[in-house]
């Protein structure tokens, strides 16, 4: 299998530490969400940013492959850190809230959203491992 892209991130100090990527594009302090001070991020925010960007890229690609123009997709991804009744440690769940402009029917938009969910590498990586709420809004 050919690798299309590879990146590395290094963390020192865990949830009360620092993380940076090998190219230094990300170079931030990390704190638990409960201790957020506005100057640090947390793993959940980083996951939300990556997943939202990846999913929206997949959604935009699927729309373009189906010759849908001017839909201007927007994706907001909510990551929740929840109690896990089956384990001592918490678990993640996500809500993917997508918006597209009213240039296609709700039915077609939902099909393309589902196609994006099948295509997105983050969705593939998490499929069957976390709860995902997939929501769509067609706006004027």
Curated annotation (Swiss-Prot):
GO biological process, one term: response to oxidative stress
Family annotation (InterPro entries): KH_dom-like_a/b, OHR, OsmC/Ohr_fam, OsmC/Ohrsf
Pfam families: OsmC
Family note: Belongs to the OsmC/Ohr family.
Protein name per its UniProtKB record: Organic hydroperoxide resistance protein-like
